[in-house]
Each structure stands twice: as structure tokens, then as C-alpha cells.
Amino acid sequence: KECMTDETVCYIHNHNDCCGSCLCLNGPIARPWEMMVGNCKCGPKA
């Protein structure tokens, strides 16, 4: 399965599809509400 490259916005339904981790502004621990509003992006493995 293809993974989503860094800088791709990741949401709660697809955050596991990042090649690395789904990183939110407040740190690598993804907060569900931040994912819902599109504040998180794929980035390096946390």
C-alpha cells in the first residue's frame, strides 16, 4: 500500500497511512480534534 509523504495533511481516518508519523502542531502525539480540523501533517517517524 502506498504511504503518504511528509507534509501531507493527515486526518484521524488515515493517520496510519503516513510514511512516517502524523505530527500535530503540539507534538507527535496526535490529538484527535487536531486531526479532525486538519492541523496535522505527515513527517519523520516520531
Swiss-Prot record:
Insecticidal toxin. It inhibits insect voltage-gated sodium channels (Nav) by partially blocking the channel pore in DUM neurons from the American cockroach, not by acting as a gating modifier. The inhibition is only partially reversible after prolonged washout. In vivo, the toxin causes flaccid paralysis followed by death when injected into Heliothis virescens larvae. It also causes uncoordinated movements followed by full paralysis to sheep blowflies (Lucilia cuprina). This is Mu-segestritoxin-Sf1f. Transmembrane segments: none annotated. Disulfide bonds join 3-19, 10-22, 18-42, 24-40. Residues 31-33 are annotated as: Keys region for toxin activity. Keywords: Disulfide bond, Knottin, Secreted, Toxin. InterPro entries: Insecticidal_knottin-like_sf, Toxin_28. Belongs to the neurotoxin 16 (SFI) family. It is found in: Secreted. It comes from Segestria florentina (Tube-web spider). One of its GO terms (molecular function) is toxin activity. Pfam families: Toxin_28. The presence of a 'disulfide through disulfide knot' structurally defines this protein as a knottin. Expressed by the venom gland. The keyword Amino-acid biosynthesis does not apply. The keyword Secreted applies. GO terms for cellular component: extracellular region.
